[in-house]
Structures are given as C-alpha cells and as structure tokens.
C-alpha cells in the first residue's frame, strides 16, 4: 500500500502502438486484463515495453497477445521471463464471442493500442477491433492530417 500522502499515477501509459491508428480503421475498442508474471510487471513499471509489431489472436476460445516485447527485468536473475512469450488476455465470455465472430466472419483484426496501469495498479490493455486500410486510404488520411495542420497554423497566424 502507498502511504496516505502520496499521489498515485492514474492510467499511466506504458506502451502505445501509434502506427495502428494510421494502418487500421478502428471499429471498436475493448479493455482487457493481462496475465503476467512478476518480473513482467516490474519490467512494465519501468516503462519498457513494445507492442508496435504485436497482434492478438483467438485460439481455443481464448484471446492471446502475440509478439509483444517486454524486456527481461535486470534485477531478477534466473527466474526471469521470456521477452516475446504469448500472453493471455482477460476478457468476458461475451466480449470473446463478439470478437471471435467479427474476426472470423468479417475479416477484421485484433490490434493492441496501448498498455497502461489503471487506478488500482493493474496492467490493462486497450484492444481494438480494426479493419486494415488500403494504400489510398492511408494517403487520404495523411492528406487530411496535413491539411488540418496547415489550417491550424493559418488560424494561429491570422487569428
């Protein structure tokens, strides 16, 4: 327990997949818990994680996080974890069924957006149900983003 006078960091983002919003059209987001080992939690608390190349997959009625990188905790000697191991995601049965049906039927993908600690200190992941963008859609969103930047500059200068 933290002392009474200390302030707790609420929703501290540890890792973020910034390219996901550019490469995918986000349909819906879910909050999922992570099944982690002790050294993985300590490594996350140090802020060292990478989910840029990771994805989630449905296997045997469960959702798994694959190819996420949590480096080894340096102070743990031989009881360390494997950095790129598969990690189980904790979702309700209804959410798992909804995600499985969307992925199988509509050809969507499960993309992790960010890993963070909630107000109770638990490691959570924001998981997105997404559809991949085509190349012309990516170009269009990039043009729109550049135009919005130019607009804000013009309004600021002439404001």
Swiss-Prot record:
Primary site of residence: cytoplasm
User: Which Pfam family, any one of them, does this sequence belong to?
Assistant: SmpB
In terms of domain of life, where is this protein from? Bacteria
Q: Which InterPro entries match?
A: SmpB (IPR023620), SsrA-bd_prot (IPR000037), SsrA-bd_prot_CS (IPR020081)
Q: Which segments show compositional bias classed as Basic and acidic residues?
A: 137-159
Q: Name one GO biological process term.
A: trans-translation
According to the record, the residues making up region (Disordered) are 131-159
Q: Which compartment or compartments is the protein found in? A: Cytoplasm
**What keywords tag this UniProt record?**
Cytoplasm, RNA-binding
Which SUPFAM superfamilies does the entry link to? Small protein B (SmpB)
Among its keywords, does the record have Thylakoid? Answer: no
List the GO terms this entry assigns under cellular component, sorted alphabetically. cytosol
Q: Name one GO molecular function term.
A: RNA binding
Q: Which residues form the signal peptide?
A: none
Record-stated family: Belongs to the SmpB family.
* Free-text function comment from the UniProt entry: Required for rescue of stalled ribosomes mediated by trans-translation. Binds to transfer-messenger RNA (tmRNA), required for stable association of tmRNA with ribosomes. tmRNA and SmpB together mimic tRNA shape, replacing the anticodon stem-loop with SmpB. tmRNA is encoded by the ssrA gene; the 2 termini fold to resemble tRNA(Ala) and it encodes a 'tag peptide', a short internal open reading frame. During trans-translation Ala-aminoacylated tmRNA acts like a tRNA, entering the A-site of stalled ribosomes, displacing the stalled mRNA.
List the HAMAP family: SmpB (MF_00023)
Protein name, per record: SsrA-binding protein
Name the source organism.
Rhizobium etli (strain ATCC 51251 / DSM 11541 / JCM 21823 / NBRC 15573 / CFN 42)
- Read off the lineage from the record: Bacteria, Pseudomonadati, Pseudomonadota, Alphaproteobacteria, Hyphomicrobiales
Question: Source gene?
Answer: smpB
């Amino acid at each position: 327990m933290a002392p009474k006078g200390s302030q707790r960091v609420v929703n501290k983002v540890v890792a973020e997949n910034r390219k996901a919003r550019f490469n995918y059209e986000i349909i819906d987001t879910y909050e999922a818990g992570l099944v982690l080992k002790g050294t993985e939690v300590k490594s996350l608390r140090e802020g060292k994680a990478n989910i840029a190349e990771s994805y989630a997959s449905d296997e045997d009625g469960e959702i798994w996080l694959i190819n996420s990188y949590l480096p080894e905790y340096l102070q743990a000697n031989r009881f360390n974890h494997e950095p790129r191991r598969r990690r189980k995601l904790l979702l309700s049965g209804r959410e798992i069924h909804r995600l499985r049906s969307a992925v199988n039927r509509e050809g969507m993908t499960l993309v992790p957006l960010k890993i963070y600690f909630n107000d109770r200190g638990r490691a959570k992941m924001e998981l997105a149900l997404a559809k991949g963008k085509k190349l012309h859609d990516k170009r269009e969103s990039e043009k729109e983003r550049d135009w919005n930047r130019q607009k804000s500059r013009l309004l600021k200068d002439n404001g």
